Amino acid sequence: FLIRRLNQQVDEIISRKGGLANKTLIVEFARGGERGYADALSQLSPEILKRAVILYVSVSFEESWRRNVARYDEKRRSGLLTHSVPRAEMEATYGTDDWFNIAPAHYGTISVKGTNVPYTTMNNEPESKDPQVLGPRYKTALDAVHSLWKRSQDR
């Protein structure tokens, strides 16, 4: 349902004058299931896919669990970013990650419904909140995927 709604909204935006020109739309997916990413990507519209790049932020399950526990704040537990998921739910919902099945290389393109979508995988461990660490980490990954995207647009 959510991806279908996203497709509709993007189609509406694209149909307007100026649409998504010079704009970035970020869609975040969470891992989960033997075909979680593959299934989610396969539901995106061709209009989204032909404009898309993927930045996969790689974090081990154990690190995800550690961050889940660390961000929990009893006093503000109703907050969007302060909640916690029980370990059993984390394992059941997010314990499986199919990303490396569909994108085994560090960067490249994956074919989704006949569209080659550029991607790069960025390791996000160890965790950091330091801009001096995060800046170069993200810059390297985003430069790589931007280069792949530019090459795909030249074809």
Predicted regions and their residues:
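Glycine-rich phosphate-binding loop used to anchor ATP phosphates in small-molecule kinases
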Residues: F1-L49
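Hydrophobic anchor at the start of a short beta-strand
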Residues: T24, A52, Y119
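Conserved phosphate-donor/acceptor-positioning beta-strand/loop module used by diverse small-molecule
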Residues: V27-A30, E47-A70
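Short, exposed beta-strand "edge-strand" segments with a Pro/Gly-rich flavor and a Y/T-containing core
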Residues: A38-S42, V53-S58, G79-V85
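Conserved GTP-binding G-domain of TRAFAC-class P-loop NTPases and closely related GTPase folds
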Residues: P46, E62-R155
